[in-house]
Amino acid sequence: MKKIFTLLIALLLCSCARSYSEDIRRPAVAGMFYPGNKEELAGKVDDFLANAKKSDIKGRILAIIVPHAGYEYSGQVAAYSFKQLEGTDFKKIIIISPSHYAGFDGISVYNKGSFETPLGLVRIDEELANRVISKNKRFIFYPEAHLKEHAIEVELPFLQRMYKYKDFKIVPITMGNPEANDIGILSNALYDVMDKNTLLIISVDLSHYYPYDKAVELDTNSTGAIEKLDTQ
């Protein structure tokens, strides 16, 4: 299992005014990356999910990989991953993303309050977040890493619609300017804290800006390495 975490985090790293009143992280890209209106957003996400096919997956889901571009570009693709959660009941969801806006040293773990979207609040699993932070000095809470970051925010409406009648909490983790051993540090921490009620979401767009055939080649190589547990 530890190899899976290492591969997924390595994959993520290859892509490459304050709003914390009352410990609520306000939406940064509502109305831009996805609809800012509650009803419109719910309808769009529901349509994406309705058009996605659920695969016949054997065994327990440990993690999903999802893109984080605007819904116009990647919403339907993201829905295919989230569709696989149908029938599951994860209580704790760890979401890992790169940092697109804030340069910082370390791995920032958001450990208090809630994230807000037009669909409502998503609570932070503070106990789990602090357990992760306690594992290594590379784990910190750097608020600026999360202030404008879209890569975690855009995944939340899918969770809110998939799990709209269920109680779940999240642990947002954003990677800064990683050192070579950060992949191992995070993988080891995840291995220690995750249980059968925990899902890992890797928010990553894979290849960018390539012609279609080249993008398929690169992304197939990446997914093939994951399937083979090839950490090299």
Located regions from the model:
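Active-site histidine-anchored catalytic micro-motif
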Residues: Y20-Q232
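Sec-dependent N-terminal signal peptides
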Residues: I4-L13
